[in-house]
Amino acid sequence: MTTIITVRKGGKVVMAGDGQVSLGQTVMKGNARKVRRIGKGEVIAGFAGATADAFTLLDRLEKKLEQYPGQLMRAAVELAKDWRTDKYLRNLEAMMLVADKSTTLAITGNGDVLEPEHGAIAIGSGGNYAFAAARAMMDTDKSAEEVARQSLDIAADICVYTNHNLVVETLDAE
């Protein structure tokens, strides 16, 4: 799997993810890009789970953002509805984090659209480790990027499905 984290702090929103792609117990690739900008660069998206499934969902989210420009929450809710009810999409195995200047969301195949309450959220195999590390650093003087990077480094030290090859994207937050 992988680990993706989003941290909202100090006027910035940072999403970071590692680059490991595993097939069973074998590392197939170490530098995959699982965090990227979508929606004309105004939204950051990251995914954990089956890569092909995640790309399908990213494509669907981009279409929803075109349909509902500037409305990340609405686009995410519409994607979650489709994901939960469509016969094909229902079988996709992935989770997504998405963020724009004002909103951070986790989107799941169960139809959940979750907004974090503590400024950080993480998904994937090392998500719990990264989230706990981020929560511990949120009240320090570290920047959002420092919190995200250090949280992923901690997760990568613990989780065998997460590596230290990070991709980081940043937006100015409201």
Swiss-Prot record:
InterPro entries reported for this sequence: ATP-dep_Prtase_HsIV_su (IPR022281), Ntn_hydrolases_N (IPR029055), Proteasome_sua/b (IPR001353), Proteasome_suB-type (IPR023333)
Predominant subcellular localization, coarse grouping: cytoplasm
Chain sites annotated for binding Na(+): A156, C159, T162
Catalytic activity: ATP-dependent cleavage of peptide bonds with broad specificity
Function: Protease subunit of a proteasome-like degradation complex believed to be a general protein degrading machinery.
Name this polypeptide is given: ATP-dependent protease subunit HslV
Source species: Agrobacterium fabrum (strain C58 / ATCC 33970)
KW Hydrolase (keyword) present: yes
UniProt keyword list: Allosteric enzyme, Cytoplasm, Hydrolase, Metal-binding, Protease, Sodium, Threonine protease
Subcellular location(s) per record: Cytoplasm
Sequence similarity: Belongs to the peptidase T1B family. HslV subfamily.
Active-site residue list: T2
Family annotation (PANTHER family): ATP-DEPENDENT PROTEASE SUBUNIT HSLV, METALLOPROTEASE TLDD
Gene Ontology CC: HslUV protease complex; proteasome core complex
Any one Gene Ontology molecular-function term assigned to this protein's record: threonine-type endopeptidase activity
Domain of life: Bacteria
EC main group: hydrolase
Gene (UniProt): hslV
CDD domains: protease_HslV
Pfam families, per database record: Proteasome (PF00227)
EC nos: 3.4.25.2
rRNA processing among keywords: no
Gene3D superfamilies recorded: Glutamine Phosphoribosylpyrophosphate, subunit 1, domain 1
GO biological process: proteolysis involved in protein catabolic process
Quaternary structure annotation from Swiss-Prot or TrEMBL: A double ring-shaped homohexamer of HslV is capped on each side by a ring-shaped HslU homohexamer. The assembly of the HslU/HslV complex is dependent on binding of ATP.
Activity regulation, per record: Allosterically activated by HslU binding.
